[in-house]
């Protein structure tokens, strides 16, 4: 059977870059990793509680963390940053305070920057959130998949593959359904592919959503 590898890790150093940039002593590495997890969870929870688009999406594509001895720089890539910036100017400061409290960083400065993404629906995370919202509202999975593909086509991507697994439409037996549009060359290392896996809780149980987007050839 085919051995499936994570498309992002497979391409690290060629078309993908790390989302965390820092160095640590081997003994302290796990602490740094845990700190990153806390930062990401804290930001996602804050956005989930305070800012939600009508469709129930957070709109975060990715969070990059850069650390130096005296500074932690966090860059949040958002598809819809207006929600965080224009709503209340103090929202970013409040988020910064929350993260600082969570980390308890006394002697390090913390900076949060928000960057807008030009094509939000070209990002697998945002698309997965969109599909999850549709499935929670009991929209048929085929409709949700097709709508997601339509949105991606507007973002000028070269190909997309969407897979949903679990008790689809509340059926007794779990199954896997997928749909592909355009090219998705998973074997080609030079192909820039974005990938995300996302779990969504519906009234029938947990569904897994996986999305591969072929952005461009390097």
Curated annotation (Swiss-Prot):
Listed GO MF terms: rRNA binding; structural constituent of ribosome
Keyword Ribosomal protein appears in the UniProt entry: yes
Domain (KH type-2) ranges: 47-118
GO biological process, one term: translation
Pfam family membership, one: Ribosomal_S3_C
Gene Ontology CC terms, in alphabetical order: chloroplast; cytosolic small ribosomal subunit
Keywords from the named record: Chloroplast, Plastid, Ribonucleoprotein, Ribosomal protein, RNA-binding, rRNA-binding
Top-level taxon in the UniProt lineage: Eukaryota
Cysteines joined through disulfide linkages: none
Location within or outside the cell: Plastid, Chloroplast
Family, as annotated: Belongs to the universal ribosomal protein uS3 family.
Matching HAMAP family: Ribosomal_uS3_B
NCBIfam families with a match to the protein in the record: rpsC_bact
Known partners and oligomeric status: Part of the 30S ribosomal subunit.
Protein's name according to its UniProt entry: Small ribosomal subunit protein uS3c
The organism of origin for this protein: Arabis hirsuta
């Amino acid at each position: 059977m085919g051995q499936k590898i994570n498309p992002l890790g497979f391409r690290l150093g060629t078309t993908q870059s790390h989302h965390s940039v820092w160095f640590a002593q081997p003994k302290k590495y796990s602490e740094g990793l845990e700190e990153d997890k806390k930062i990401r969870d804290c930001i996602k929870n804050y956005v989930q509680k305070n800012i939600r688009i009508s469709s129930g999406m957070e709109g975060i594509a990715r969070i990059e963390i850069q650390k130096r001895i005296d500074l932690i720089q966090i860059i949040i890539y958002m598809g819809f940053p207006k929600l965080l910036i224009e709503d209340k100017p103090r929202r970013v400061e409040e988020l910064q305070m929350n993260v600082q409290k969570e980390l308890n960083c006394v002697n390090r400065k913390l900076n949060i920057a928000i960057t807008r993404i030009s094509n939000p629906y070209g990002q697998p995370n945002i698309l997965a959130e969109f599909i999850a919202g549709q499935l929670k509202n009991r929209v048929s999975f085929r409709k949700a998949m097709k709508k997601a593909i339509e949105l991606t086509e507007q973002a000028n991507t070269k190909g997309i593959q969407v897979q949903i697994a679990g008790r689809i439409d509340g059926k007794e037996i779990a199954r896997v359904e997928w749909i592909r549009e355009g090219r998705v060359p998973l074997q080609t290392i030079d192909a820039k592919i974005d990938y995300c896996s996302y779990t969504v809780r519906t009234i029938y149980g947990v569904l897994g959503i996986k999305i591969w987007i072929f952005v461009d050839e390097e």
